[in-house]
């Protein structure tokens, strides 16, 4: 038999969670990319520490859901058919950004793109491949994707700042992997701020608040 693998692009319903600015106009926008097996609403709740009335927060949810430890989680991609999955979520995030910018006044806002855990790789790829620019690329608790187009990343970072944030006792990512990522970034002449904290595989809320919410 002549078996063939083909692809078909189809419409898909995507879910996201949003926290609107109480003041009606946002001076800071956050695109928050969750980690493996998380859901958008749960991830957005991690940012309740952002009390600023003029911050608009949006957490998109990965397009693939699955059962995980008797709960439901979402994922951004797997190794299987990875290029199409990357293309799908870049297109999805482009459409989400288009919708948000049409519906809310973000003309003078600061744009923050934050990725946590698996969401770091998604955030980096969207930062490079996406149609929108961000003032800050904030990468929390993950190694850095080795297949990055560093030429394009350097070009994008001319108008942005990148933060590489990691715990010294991360139970998911070893210090060796963090150090390999830092070395990779330096070798490719990437300007970034390396920030470590005493802690596990978590979002350091105090650190994020001090950096971006004061």
Task: Name these PLM-found stretches.
Residues 43-46, 150, 174-184:
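Short alpha-helix in the alpha/beta-hydrolase fold that links the catalytic acid
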Residues 163, 176-214:
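C-terminal catalytic histidine-bearing segment of alpha/beta-hydrolase fold enzymes
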Residues 163-166, 170:
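Short beta-strand/loop motif that positions the catalytic acidic residue
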Residues 105-115:
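Alpha/beta-hydrolase fold nucleophile elbow
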Residues 114-119, 123:
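Gly/Ala-rich beta-loop-alpha elbow adjacent to hydrolase catalytic centers
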Residues 45, 125-129:
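Active-site signature of alpha/beta-hydrolase-fold catalytic machinery across serine-
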Residues 8-106:
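Serine-hydrolase catalytic machinery in alpha/beta-hydrolase-like enzymes
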Residues 132-144:
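A conserved short beta-strand
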